[in-house]
Amino acid sequence: MLEKLKTSLINSPVIKRGEYNYFIHPISDGVPSIDPHMVEEIAEYILQITDIKKVDTILTIEAMGIPVANALSLKTGIPLTIVRKRPYFLEGEVELSQRTGYSKGALYINGLKKGDRVIIVDDVISTGGTLIALVKALKTIGVEIQDVISVIGRGTGYLQLKELGVEPKILVTIDVSEKGVEIKNVFGNE
């Protein structure tokens, strides 16, 4: 179960960004190259743990959620919408502010309306800042969130999503130290 993902996480290099232990991984960074078989493994697993028939749109955040979300879109035929980092000034565009552990900025939602049913697919949840801002914005629009799935989780940022009434599914939960990446949990093995 998610063997390619787990093995690649364990083998991920860790670098220091200030006091922060940052792991470098194809799913979260695109470095080294993204193994298409690993992406397929992840997409297949997501299809096992979510009711995709209740979804109108697969939603992801630019940039690193795109490979997995695109694989899901191709497998299901469900359209993919990408929350972008720049505005397009289209009618109905919604701007949201997000803050992560190491960055902040604006994101822009286009093409969603009240009553749309989405699954949110993201690469990593750590502080939860991006997903919290996105969930709040979607609720304001009136979009129905069917599921929130993060391929990788570290830290406790997901707890704030629970306070918003969203129970994220984190495929692989990790700890990161100077020594490397340690697998703490795989969704479904609780």
UniProtKB/Swiss-Prot annotation:
InterPro entries: HGPRTase-like (IPR026597), PRibTrfase_dom (IPR000836), PRTase-like (IPR029057), Pur/Pyrimidine_PRTase (IPR050118). Belongs to the purine/pyrimidine phosphoribosyltransferase family. Archaeal HPRT subfamily. The keyword Transferase applies. It comes from the Archaea. GO terms for molecular function: guanine phosphoribosyltransferase activity; hypoxanthine phosphoribosyltransferase activity. The lineage of its organism: Archaea, Methanobacteriati, Methanobacteriota, Stenosarchaea group, Methanomicrobia. GO terms for cellular component: cytoplasm. Its main location: cytoplasm. Its EC number is 2.4.2.8. It is found in: Cytoplasm. Homodimer. Keywords: Cytoplasm, Glycosyltransferase, Purine salvage, Transferase. Pfam families: Pribosyltran. HAMAP family: Hypx_phosphoribosyltr. It catalyses: IMP + diphosphate = hypoxanthine + 5-phospho-alpha-D-ribose 1-diphosphate; GMP + diphosphate = guanine + 5-phospho-alpha-D-ribose 1-diphosphate. Signal peptide: none annotated. Catalyzes a salvage reaction resulting in the formation of IMP that is energically less costly than de novo synthesis. CDD domains: PRTases_typeI (cd06223). One of its GO terms (biological process) is purine ribonucleoside salvage. Pathway: Purine metabolism; IMP biosynthesis via salvage pathway; IMP from hypoxanthine: step 1/1. This is Hypoxanthine/guanine phosphoribosyltransferase.
